């Protein structure tokens, strides 16, 4: 089941432990799916159930320790983890707390994710109980974890390239999939099937919109309203391969394209091209945001950011936005996602996935057509 060789997980763990040493952190407690998977290789859709908590502790030295419900023992044993401690769950009176107390014994400064984009995937009541039973105190380890997860290995980048290729091939079939009169929810369904046919393992994220000359919303479930001549259809997919996401979209006109839609598309294509030409290691996320936003004319969208990190999550730290001073470094994988508002409440979004390299970034997605494609 394991998606990488043991050396991949060993390197990730050692990098974090080096950061722990530098910050006087004795142990790190992880309880969220992306972090547990990142450091162990434990990949399962069973996380969809909120009933059972799952824990991994990274000590100062050695391999991580898994403290998990017994139902996950066999799968965890197929990863590189040796120390697996389990309990019969659900068990409301003790959902792994006594085991955590044992593992964390002697740790004075315990890291846990507290920063932006973090969450606590255990009952708050249990967390308070855990704090009362240990001698150590908890501190924010978000920067320690993010510092490692920001930089992708070449093996991770290859998987990201492959899932982008799956979506590329699926988008290339648009002329055979979509047509005037087709209900929007049917278009979504056909595209999801196509993604699976082309090699995606899962399609956990597929959003989009459609409307005359543009769309007004990109996060609602698709309606049964038929596509009409003059509509702009946009689909944005976060499909996965070995648990890694692509995240990009494509736009098409149905039948005919209005001048206003063509102009919006052309503007977004050109500003994306500018970003692809200008982005370099050493730039901050804020600088990239300003580069894109200024070329769009400023204030053209209220979405708040023009891209983000991507990897084992659909959206990862950092964000291409104001006040994000994260410095771009080689092997970071991010999206470039300019958007603009126009007409009577209409909007359009373009998105590509890139890897930061020495010099110009590497485009992981097949570049969108220079002119708005028309499906006839």
Task: Identify the residue ranges that each predicted region occupies.
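Active-site neighborhoods and metal-handling regions in enzymes and metal-associated proteins
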Residues: 1-376
């Amino acid at each position: 089941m394991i998606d990488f060789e043991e050396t991949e997980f060993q390197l990730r763990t050692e990098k974090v432990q080096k950061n722990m040493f530098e910050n006087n952190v004795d142990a790190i407690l992880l309880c969220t799916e992306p972090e547990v998977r990142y450091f162990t290789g434990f990949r399962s859709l069973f996380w969809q159930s909120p009933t059972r908590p799952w824990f991994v502790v990274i000590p100062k030295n050695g391999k991580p320790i898994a403290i998990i419900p017994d139902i996950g023992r066999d799968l965890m044993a197929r990863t590189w983890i040796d120390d697996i401690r389990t309990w019969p769950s659900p068990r409301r009176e003790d959902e792994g707390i006594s085991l955590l107390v044992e593992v964390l014994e002697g740790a004075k400064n315990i890291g846990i994710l507290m920063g932006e984009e973090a969450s606590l995937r255990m009952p708050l009541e249990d967390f308070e109980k855990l704090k009362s039973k240990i001698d150590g105190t908890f501190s924010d380890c978000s920067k320690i974890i993010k510092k490692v997860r920001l930089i992708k290995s070449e093996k991770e980048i290859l998987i990201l390239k492959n899932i982008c290729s799956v979506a590329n091939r699926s988008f290339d079939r648009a002329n055979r999939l979509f047509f005037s009169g087709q209900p929007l929810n049917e278009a979504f369904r056909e595209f999801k099937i196509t993604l699976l046919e082309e090699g995606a393992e899962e399609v956990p994220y597929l959003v989009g919109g459609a409307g005359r000359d543009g769309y007004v919303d990109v996060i609602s479930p698709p309606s049964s309203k038929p596509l009409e001549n003059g509509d702009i259809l946009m689909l944005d997919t976060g499909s996965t391969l070995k648990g890694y996401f692509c995240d990009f979209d494509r736009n098409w006109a149905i039948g005919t394209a209005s001048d206003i839609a063509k102009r919006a598309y052309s503007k977004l294509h050109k500003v994306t091209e500018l970003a692809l030409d200008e982005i370099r290691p050493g730039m901050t996320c804020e600088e990239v945001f300003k580069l894109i936003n200024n070329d769009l004319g400023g204030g053209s969208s209220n979405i708040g950011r023009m891209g983000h990190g991507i990897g084992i999550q659909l959206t990862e730290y950092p964000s291409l936005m104001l006040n994000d001073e994260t410095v771009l470094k080689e092997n970071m994988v991010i999206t470039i996602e300019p958007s603009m508002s126009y007409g009577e409440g209409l909007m359009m979004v373009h998105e590509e996935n890139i890897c930061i390299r020495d010099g110009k970034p590497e485009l992981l997605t097949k570049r969108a057509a220079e002119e708005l494609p028309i499906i006839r």
